[in-house]
Amino acid sequence: MKNKKKIKNKISYSLLERELMGSRENEIAPEDCASFLSRITYSWTQKMLIYGYFNTLQLKDVPDLPESIKVENTTPILDEFKFKKNEKFGLVWFIYKRFVMVRHKTSIIVQIFSAIVSVLSPLCLRAFILYVQREPSEKSFLVGLFYAVLVLMGALFLSISLQHTYWYTMKCGLEVKGALTSKIYSKTLKLSNYGKRLYSSGTILNLISSDCQNFADYFWIDYLILLVAPIQIIALLALLCWTIGYSGLVGFLIMILSLPLSTFLSSKVSKYQLLSLKYSDKRCNLISEMINGIYLLKLYNWELFFINRIEKQRKQQLINLYKRMAFWALDKMVVQISSALVLVSSFTVYTLIANKSITYEVAFTSISIFSNLREPCELLPQAIQRLLSLLPSSDRICKFLYETSEIIENLSTITTTNGTNQDILITNGTFDWNDNNKNINVGVDSQENKNDDDDMIELVNNDSIETTTSYVLDDINFIAPAGKLTIICGVVGSGKSSLINGLIGEIYKVSGQVTIPNTVSFTNQQPFLVNSTLRENILFGLPMDMDRYKKVLESCSLLTDLQSMPGKDLTEIGERGINLSGGQKQRINLARALYSNSDCYILDEPLSAVDPQVATHLFNHCIQGELMNNKTRILVTHQLQFIPSADHIVVLENGILTQGTYQELKDKFDFESIMKTKKLNLELNNSNNNNNNNNNKEEEEDVENLEKEQQQQVINVNDVISNEFESKNDELNSKLLVNEERETGSVELNIYKMYIKYGSSFIFFFTMIMMYIISQLLFLLFDYWLTIWSDEKKNKNGTKGDSFYILYYLLLVGLFSVFLGIRYFMILHFTNSSSKNLHDKLLKSIGYASCQFFDINSSGRINNRFTKDIAEVDLILMVLSDALYCGSTVLVAVLMMIVINPLIVFPFLLLALFYYLVQKLYRSSSLELKRLENISRSPIFSILSESFNGLITIRSFRQQSRFIKRMQDSINVNLRLFYYNFSAHRWIGIKIEIISSAAVFLSAFFSLFNSNTGLSVLAVTTSLSLTGYLNWCIRQYIEFSMKMSSVERIENYINQPREGDTMNVDMELESNLPINWPQKGEIQFKNVEIKYRPNLKPSLKNISFDIKSNEKIGIVGKSGSGKSTTMLALFRMIECSKGSIHIDGIDISKISLSKLRNSIGICPQEPFIFSGTIRKNIDPFGIYSDSEIWLALEKVKLKETISLLPMKIDTIIHEQANLSFGQKQLLCLTRVLLKSPKLVFFDEHSSSIDYFTAHQLNISVKENITNSTTLTIAHRIDTIIDSDRILVIDSGELIEIFDKNNINNNINNQNSKFKKFVQHTSDHFKNY
C-alpha cells in the first residue's frame, strides 16, 4: 500500500477548463449502468475511491456527469418561467413543480418511507424492552435474538432510507444550481450599458456564488422536510399519546410553543443574512475594482485607500454575520433545551397528575418517540429558516433576470441587411444611455449615501459627464456609404462613442431607424482580450483560414512582435492583455476584426496607442488594405492626418453632426474649428520646409526602405506561426499564468494550528472542546437519571418520591443550558475572530502583492479566494459546531456503552477498525475531489469577469453561444466534481450505517445476558443514537476538513511574497530624507536591465542616461520597444535584474515603495476610474480643499463640465460610467496637477484626446508643471517636440538621445529612427 505524503501538485485552471470541456464526454456515467444492488449501496463509486486511495485523483480520473444533471439539459426548463419583479415565491414554486414533482418524485417516495420507519422503530424498541423485563424462565434465546434483529432492522432501514433521500435531493439541488447559474450568465451577456451600471461584475459574481448556492442548499432535503415533516410529526404524536396518554400532549405543546420562538430567531437569521449579503456585494465589487485596476493603484500608491474601503464593507458584513450566527446559536439552544423540557414536562404530568409510575417501556419508548419526533421538529424550523433565507436570494435572482430582460427588450432594434451594397443609415435617430429614458440620479439621494459613498452606486448617465438631462444624440441623420471609408472625428465628449454604440445596438434608441449590414465587426477603444493564446484571440471562435490569417498578421503589423514572443502566435495572453503593450493590444483587437471578414467594420480609435509609423502601416495595409478595402468601414479617430483619405467624413460637436466629403467640409466653419490641429503642426512643417536637405530623392529612398522591410516580413510570416509539430512546445514555453497550486493528502496540521491562532489560543480552543463534552455528558445523564427513576419504581423500594427525581432532572437541564450557552458563545467568538483575521491578512497580502503575482494569477482565481473561500470560512461555525457536537456525543455514548457492557469492547474494536479503514479510503478521495471542486470554480469566475468586460465585443462578433458553451462546460465540471464527492458521501454513509446498526445489534445482543434491565435498555437506546451520530460525525469531520482546505488555499495566498520583499530598505536613509523628497528631480539610470520573468529576454538592455532637475524629457519608440517598461522600472513595478536607478542621488531600491511612488506623479496610458465621487477619484485621501480641486479641474478644461452636474464634484461615478476615454484621462491629469510632484511621468496621456484638446492640455502642463522634471511617452510629435531632450528607445535599447537644439539635425539624418517617427506623423499634414 502506497503511503500518501504531503505533496504539491499543480493544476492550471485554464488547462482544467480545456481538459474538462471534452474529457470523458462520451463515457457513460457509472450510475446509469449500475445494478440494483450497486445503486442501493453506491458501490458504483467504489472504483474511483479505490483508485483515489492509491493515487492522487486527477480530473481525468473522475467519470462523466449523468446527462440529466448537465446544464444544457436543465437550463431550458427555466426558460418556461416568466421572471418578474417580486416573484420570489413564484420561482421557488416553479422549481417545485418542474424539478421536484416532474424529475424527482422518487425523493418524495423515499422520504415518506423514511418517515414510516421512524414511526415503527420505537415500537420495535418497545417490544425488545418488554422482552428483557421478562423473568428468566419466560425468556428464549431465539425469541430474544428475534427482537434484537427487529431493533437492528428498524435502525438499518431508517438509516439507509435517509441516505437515499439525501442523494436524490442532492441531484435536484445540483440541477437547480446549474440551471440558475447558466441562466444568470446568459442574461449577463445581454446586459446593456445601463444594465452594467445597475449590476456590477461583483454583484453578478455574488448571485452565482451565494444566491445560486442557497437554492442548492434548500433543494437538498429542506423542501422534503416541509412536505413530509408535518405528517411525520402527527403520526409520531399519535404514537406518543398511545404510549403515555395526554401527558405526551403536554410535551408536544412545549415543542409547539418553542416553534414560534424558533421561527422568530430564523427570521432574524434571514434578516441578517440579507444584510450580510448586501455588504458582501459591495465588498466583492470593490475587490473586483481593486484587482482590475491593481497596476494603476500601485502607481498611485493607493493600495491602502482601497484596502480601507474594502475593510469598511467587511466590518459591516462581519457585524451582520455575527448577529446572524448569534441568532442561529440561540435557535439551536432553543431546540436542544426544549427537547429536554419536553421530556421532563411529559413525565411530570404523567407521574404527578396522571398518578402513573415510570417504567422502562414507558420511559425509553417515549424517549425514542421524542427522539424521532425531535428530528422533524428541529429540521422543520431549519427548513423554514432556509426557505426564508432563500427568498431574498430568489428575489435578487428574479429581479436581475427580469430587469435584464427588460433592458434587452428596450435596446435599440436595428434593421439588418445582407451583403455590402447597403449604406449604413440612421434616420431621425434619438439615443440615450438610459434604457427607456430611465432617470439615474447623478447625486447622492439618501442620507445613507451622503454619509458613505460606498453605499453605491449612483451613476453618471450618458456618453460624457457633460449632459445630465437631455438625450445624448437627438434627431440625428447619419450615413456611411457602402464599401467606403467613413471617418468620425470630434472633440472629447462630443458624442462619437454614443454614435457608434447606437449603430451596433448598444445604446437605447428612443426613436428613429437604424439600418446596418448583417455582419459587423467592432473594435472597442479599450481592447478586449481573453486569457488564451494570441492566435485564439484573433480567430475568436472562427475556423482557421491560414491564408487569410497570414495576411491579417501582416496587415496589422504583428510580425515583428510575434518574432520576439517565446511561443510565437501561441503565446499566452494574460487577462486584459497584461503582458502586452497598449499598441499590441490594439493591433490584436484590430486583427480579430479583420479576420472575421464581416460586411462592415466599426473601429473606435484603433490607432491611438501605436506609434506613427505603425499607425500609417495600419491605415494603409489594414483599413485601406486588400482585406478590408471594399467593405464598409467606419473609423473613429483623432489621427486627423488620415482625414483627407476618407470617402466620407462625419464631424461631431455637442451631439450635432456635420457630414460630407473632405472637399465639402474643409471650408466650413464648424469643420475648421475641429481641425485647428492643422495650426499645431505648422511649426513642425515649417521646420521641415526650411531644411532643403530633405529632397525628393531621400524621401523616395525612405519609402523604398519601408517597402523592403514589409517584403521581408512577408517572406518570414511562416516563422511566427507555430505548426502542429511545434504547437505543444510553443504553448508550453509561452505559458503566462502559473499553474494553480493544489495541495494533496490531508490538510496539514499547521493549517489547523494557524486557524486556531487566528481564532484565539490553544487554551481557549481546548476549553471550548471541553464545554461540548461536558454538555453532551449532561445530556446523556438525562437518560441515565430516567433509568434510576424507573428502576426504583419497578423495585418499589425507594424512599424518594417522583418530585425528587423531577427536581434533579430540572437541575440537570439547568446545568446543561449553562454549558450549552458557554459553548456557543465561545465558538461564536472563535470563528468570528478567525474569519476576520483571515480576510484581513488575505486582503493586505493581495493588495501589496507584486505585479508579477497578478501577471501569473487570473482575476477569477483571486476572486475565488475572496468569494467562495471566504464564504466557506465565514460559515465554518455551523460545521465546526456540529462536528464537535456529534463527536462529543459519540465519544460519551461509546464510553457509556462500554461501561455498561465491558465485553462489548472486543467487537467494538473490530467495528472501529472497519470504521477506520472505510473512512480512510473515503477521506483520501473526498478531500481531493473537494480540492478539485474548489479549483474548478476559478474558470467560472474568470469567464464571467472576461465576458462582463467584453460584452460589446462578444455581442458584435455574435459569439454569445460560444461563451455560453464555455460557461456551461465549466459549470458541468464543477457540478461533476461535487456530484461524485457527494455520492462518495453516500457510499461511506451506507457503510457507517451498517457499522452503527451492528453496534445496535451487539448492544441488544449483550443486553440479553445482562441482569440489570435498566442498564441493558440504556445501552440499547444509547447505541440507537449512534446510527445517526456516527455517520454525522464522519460527514462533519470531512466537511470541516473541506472547509479547512479553503483556509489552506487562503493561507497559500497570504504567504505570497509581498512587493519589495526582495529589496533591503534602508530605514535610516529613508527617515533622513526630506518630507518633500525629491527636491531636485534628478534621475540616473545606470546599466539598467529589466526582465519580466527570469526565463525571458530582457525588455530593457543595459540602459544608462542622466536627467537633470526640471528637465523635460520626451521618450519615443515603436510599440513594444520598452518605453512603458522604463516607466515601470522607475516606479519599481518591476525590479532591476541588473544596474540601478537613482533619484536625487538616492538608490530607489533602498527606500520603501510607498515613499517612492508617493513622491512621483503619473498620468497613465489607461486611465483608472473607480466607483465613488469625482472628489474621491481625484483626491482619495481628502488632502486638498474644494478651491484647489476646482482650480485643477479648470486647468484641464473640466470645470465647466463638472459644474453642470447636480452634485458637482460630489457626483458619484462608476467603473462602468459612460465617461469618454478622453475624459477619464483628463481626470487622471487632474490628480497630477493637484499633487504637483517634483517628478512626473506622462504615459501617452493625450493618445485618446483630439489634437485641439491635446494641444490645450500640453499648454496647461507646460504652464502648471514648470518646476518639475517630466518624462513623457508619446506617439504624437507635437506632444514631445518642445522637450529639452528626446530619448529614442528601440527593442529595449536606448539608441538615440539628443536635446531640442539638435532635433532638426536628427530629422534630416537619413539613419535616424527619430526621423521615421516624425515623418509618419507629419507627412499627411503637408496636404493642408
From Swiss-Prot:
Alphabetically sorted, this entry's keywords are:
ATP-binding, Membrane, Nucleotide-binding, Repeat, Transmembrane, Transmembrane helix, Transport
Task: State a single Pfam family of this protein.
Answer: ABC_tran
Query: Which residue intervals define the domain ABC transmembrane type-1 in the entry?
Result: 104-389, 765-1046
Q: Which GO terms describe its biological process?
A: sorocarp development; transmembrane transport
Output a single Gene Ontology CC term carried by this record. Answer: membrane
Q: Please list the GO terms describing molecular function.
A: ABC-type transporter activity; ATP binding; ATP hydrolysis activity; ATPase-coupled transmembrane transporter activity
Q: What is the membrane topology here?
A: Multi-pass membrane protein
Q: SUPFAM superfamilies attached here?
A: ABC transporter transmembrane region, P-loop containing nucleoside triphosphate hydrolases
Region described as Disordered: 684-708
The secretion signal range is none
Write out the transmembrane intervals. 112-132, 140-160, 224-244, 245-265, 287-307, 333-353, 762-782, 802-822, 894-914, 988-1008, 1014-1034
The places in or outside the cell where this protein is found are: Membrane
Full protein name: ABC transporter C family member 7
Protein source organism: Dictyostelium discoideum
What gene makes this protein?
Answer: abcC7
